[in-house]
């Protein structure tokens, strides 16, 4: 009787399509894909992956999926492999195609939810690599709420040139430096050729590595898995271990919503602050929280920022990459230091079946001597977190600033207004931007773009031209995890819906103050009302297809830019 109950529990969902005489047609089709008589009582596990040679981030995911399916079969489960999409942020950056990046988060979530719900899967493993794979996967996982685990494809190793580590951001910055005459053609070409040596997601604490770190902190990935190199053997071992962990989750009936609590999100935000992670974490964690039914707000990010130091020296503003962090203890070491300081919730459940504190029991609570990737907790890079929530008459619903790696965290200057990224990029490369300017790029928000493009090309060009500490940039679009400088994104309400950013005119004085968390347009209320009365909403840029549909459905960036 015990064995029967266990088997019934393992196929707790799939028995709807495998059991009984009336399901003979279902079983007939399953036999055609490899099921045999003894398999219909087993758990059927969805293995969703985004294998693609579109991008090095995803080029090795199929191999990891093979390791997962093998481990599932060994554990007595039946894997069903299916694909989902990816859009390369790095390759589409600075082009019309970048409008599809954030859209792909929703497509990934919808596709995972659709397939695993439609096929009555008992559990789910998602293997992802590029930026939107992670939040898209976790949104789908949360909606389904079947036992699940996320497997990160792994980070790329750094490239090397003239004794320096390279990442993809090195190339974006080289564009500005070469355009400004500060770099030779030979150096420019060598940086391009050497920056990406193989498979894996972009190597600094950019968006992919930020989100993988957040997922490990939330308890939805195995310890140490978020900073492994994509090409090292331990990544394949970790993938197989994840499959075995999923089988235990089904046995114990541990669901994602048992793990993804408000406390788990607070742990994720705390780790993102400590490692100097991407602004995109704000948008994505809020969207995942929405899928979980967890009330997560911009105020939660600001509250946690104020108490959390940045003590990992990672790119884009720091020196090291994710594989360097892995070598000195990875996310578990960071979490143990935070736990000791009383900044983490140790009682949160994880996919190991144990709590955060139990997972970290044997992890040292101090950084290793002789390295400076992880600094002592009481000697951090910054005493407070680097992702600040700015409000003011230019962003009544809020905006997100990344304030690490800056000599100054405030600027007041004349607005240089552009209604698209392309217009701004042309001005930067044409040397029309000078120190003290505050660039405004608008109509790039979730609805207005549509798709909320990342502004890595203009921010990198600004840095390449030597203006990174003297020019501000404000946008209703997003920033890449590779962005740093005096930048404020996610300005809400966005221009397309008539937000104050739509009313800014060339030469208006704007004050960006990350110290007081204020974003102020120095124009009196009467003048703003006059401009508002004259403002006319622009025509939609797309009337058919996925971008048109997205623009109709998507909400404010201040609430995660969700579509449901």
UniProtKB/Swiss-Prot annotation:
Residues covered by region (Disordered): 1-23
Source organism, top-level taxon: Bacteria
Annotated InterPro entries: DHAD_IlvD/Edd (IPR050165), Dihydro-acid_dehy_C (IPR042096), DihydroxyA_deHydtase (IPR004404), DiOHA_6PGluconate_deHydtase_CS (IPR020558), ILV_EDD_C (IPR056740), ILV_EDD_N (IPR000581), IlvD/EDD_N (IPR037237)
Binding site for Mg(2+): 89, 131-132, 454
Enzyme Commission code(s) on record: 4.2.1.9
GO biological process: isoleucine biosynthetic process; L-valine biosynthetic process
Keywords from the named record: 2Fe-2S, Amino-acid biosynthesis, Branched-chain amino acid biosynthesis, Iron, Iron-sulfur, Lyase, Magnesium, Metal-binding
Annotated active site: 480 (proton acceptor)
Catalytic activity from the UniProt record: (2R)-2,3-dihydroxy-3-methylbutanoate = 3-methyl-2-oxobutanoate + H2O; (2R,3R)-2,3-dihydroxy-3-methylpentanoate = (S)-3-methyl-2-oxopentanoate + H2O
Binding residue positions for [2Fe-2S] cluster: 57, 130, 202
Needed co-factor(s): [2Fe-2S] cluster; Mg(2+)
SUPFAM superfamilies named among the record's database cross-references: IlvD/EDD N-terminal domain-like (SSF143975), LeuD/IlvD-like (SSF52016)
Free-text cofactor note: Binds 1 [2Fe-2S] cluster per subunit. This cluster acts as a Lewis acid cofactor.
Molecular function via GO: 2 iron, 2 sulfur cluster binding; dihydroxy-acid dehydratase activity; magnesium ion binding
Keyword Magnesium: yes
Pathway annotation from the record: Amino-acid biosynthesis; L-isoleucine biosynthesis; L-isoleucine from 2-oxobutanoate: step 3/4; Amino-acid biosynthesis; L-valine biosynthesis; L-valine from pyruvate: step 3/4
Biased composition (Basic residues): 1-10
Signal peptide (residue range): none
Subunit structure: Homodimer.
Record function comment: Functions in the biosynthesis of branched-chain amino acids. Catalyzes the dehydration of (2R,3R)-2,3-dihydroxy-3-methylpentanoate (2,3-dihydroxy-3-methylvalerate) into 2-oxo-3-methylpentanoate (2-oxo-3-methylvalerate) and of (2R)-2,3-dihydroxy-3-methylbutanoate (2,3-dihydroxyisovalerate) into 2-oxo-3-methylbutanoate (2-oxoisovalerate), the penultimate precursor to L-isoleucine and L-valine, respectively.
Protein name per Swiss-Prot or TrEMBL: Dihydroxy-acid dehydratase
Protein's organism: Deinococcus geothermalis (strain DSM 11300 / CIP 105573 / AG-3a)
Gene from which this protein is expressed: ilvD
């Amino acid at each position: 009787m015990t064995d029967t109950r266990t088997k019934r529990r393992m196929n707790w969902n799939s028995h709807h399509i495998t059991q009984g005489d009336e399901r003979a047609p279902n079983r007939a089709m399953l036999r055609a894909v490899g099921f045999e008589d003894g398999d219909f009582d087993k758990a059927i596990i969805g293995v969703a992956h985004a294998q693609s040679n579109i991008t090095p981030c995803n080029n090795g995911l199929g191999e990891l999926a093979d390791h997962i399916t093998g481990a599932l079969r060994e554990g007595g489960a039946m894997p069903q492999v299916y694909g989902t999409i990816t859009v390369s942020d790095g390759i589409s950056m600075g082009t019309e195609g970048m409008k599809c990046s954030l859209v792909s988060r929703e497509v990934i979530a919808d596709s995972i939810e659709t397939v695993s719900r439609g096929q009555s899967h008992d559990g789910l493993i998602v293997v992802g690599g590029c930026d939107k794979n992670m939040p898209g996967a976790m949104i789908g996982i949360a909606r389904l709420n079947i036992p699940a685990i996320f497997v990160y494809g792994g980070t790329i190793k750094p490239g090397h040139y003239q004794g320096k580590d390279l990442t993809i951001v090195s190339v974006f910055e080289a564009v500005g430096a070469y355009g400004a005459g500060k770099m030779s053609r030979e150096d420019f070409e060598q940086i391009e050729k050497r920056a990406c040596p193989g498979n894996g997601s972009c190597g600094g604490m950019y968006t992919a590595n930020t989100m993988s770190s957040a997922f490990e902190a939330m308890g939805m990935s195995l310890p140490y898995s978020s900073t492994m190199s994509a090409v090292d053997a331990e990544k394949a071992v970790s993938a197989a271990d994840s499959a075995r962990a999923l089988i235990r989750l089904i046995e114990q009936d541990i669901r994602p919503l048992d793990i993804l609590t408000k406390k788990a999100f607070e742990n994720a935000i705390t780790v993102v602050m400590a490692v100097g992670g991407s602004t995109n974490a704000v948008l994505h964690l809020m969207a995942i929280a929405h899928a979980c039914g967890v009330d997560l707000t911009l105020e939660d990010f600001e509250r946690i920022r104020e108490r959390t130091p940045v003590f990992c020296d990672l790119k884009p503003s720091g020196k090291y990459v994710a594989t360097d962090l892995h070598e000195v203890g990875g996310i578990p070491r960071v979490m143990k230091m935070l736990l000791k300081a009383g900044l983490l919730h140790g009682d949160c459940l994880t996919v190991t079946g144990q709590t955060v504190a139990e997972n970290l029991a044997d992890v040292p609570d101090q950084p290793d001597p002789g390295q400076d990737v992880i600094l002592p907790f009481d000697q951090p890079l910054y005493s407070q977190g680097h992702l600040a929530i700015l409000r003011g008459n230019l962003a009544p619903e809020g905006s997100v600033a990344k304030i690490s790696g800056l000599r100054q965290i405030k600027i007041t200057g004349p607005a240089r207004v552009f209604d698209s990224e392309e217009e701004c990029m042309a001005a930067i490369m044409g040397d029309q931007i000078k120190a003290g300017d505050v660039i405004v790029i608008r109509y790039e928000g979730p609805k207005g773009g549509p798709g909320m493009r990342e502004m890595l090309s203009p921010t990198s060009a600004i840095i390449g031209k030597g203006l990174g500490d003297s020019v501000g940039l404000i946008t209703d679009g997003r920033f890449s995890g590779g962005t740093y400088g005096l930048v404020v994104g996610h300005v809400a309400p966005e221009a397309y819906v008539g937000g104050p950013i739509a009313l800014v005119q060339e030469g208006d004085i704007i004050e960006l103050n990350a110290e007081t968390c204020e974003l102020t347009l120095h124009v009196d209320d009467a003048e703003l009302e006059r401009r508002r009365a004259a403002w006319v909403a622009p025509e939609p840029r797309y009337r058919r297809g996925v971008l048109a549909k997205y623009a109709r459905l998507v909400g404010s960036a201040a609430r995660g830019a969700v579509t449901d």
